[in-house]
Amino acid sequence: MTSIKIDKMTVEQFGEALRREAIAKQNDAFRKMILLDESVGRWVVTRAVYAEGPAFVAACILAVRKFEDFTEEMDPYGERSMGRLEIEGETVWFKIDLYDVDYEGGSDDPSEVTKTRRVLTILFPSDY
């Protein structure tokens, strides 16, 4: 999990670090939960991932749920919103986008779960 180093931060930087940590925790919970409806968010796969077949898609979903290997390269803001993994010899990415409750635009306050809906997309790098 993330850790905030507060030794040399302005109050604004500290607030931003707290916001990002909240988003990271919410993204982790979202990745690991089983959605009963779309009140929290949606999972989608690209056409190219879907074309690999149901076993491949299922393997991707399981791997995303278990994923913990976040790197600064793939997740530079520490929000745990993007990762890279290998599935059956293929590089697969996932990313989490944060929308308003109507899925029409970005959330005004991504750290507030009542104002944010998540969309997790599983994709190949070539889909990006």
List each model region and its residues.
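Compact soluble domain cores
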Residues: V11-E86
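Eukaryotic low-complexity, non-globular regulatory regions
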Residues: M1-S3
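Short, compact, well-ordered microdomains
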Residues: S81-Y128
